[in-house]
């Protein structure tokens, strides 16, 4: 995710569009672009923000921040937990980058392999 021309200003509302490996739709997260630094691109979701995919729509139970490193091979989300059931959620991904067709919109392929650290005693596991 290094295309400066496609990067919005910090504080800009945007959507993060995930897709399945076959190109089908997956999660879409309403979020706020927070900025970038040497670690990557930062996105925030305040409590009550909408996330949806085919067949499911949720409002976030807690605020979160997501980091996408320059490698574009994963997205690390840190949740305020509780009330969220997980503190850490890592989506292993492919081709996470700024969209070529929508200015200021991050997109990526969700590999459906995640690392989760729960706060309810389940510990850390691979989903």
Residue positions per predicted region:
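Residue-identity detector for threonine
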Residues: 2, 12-14, 49, 60, ...
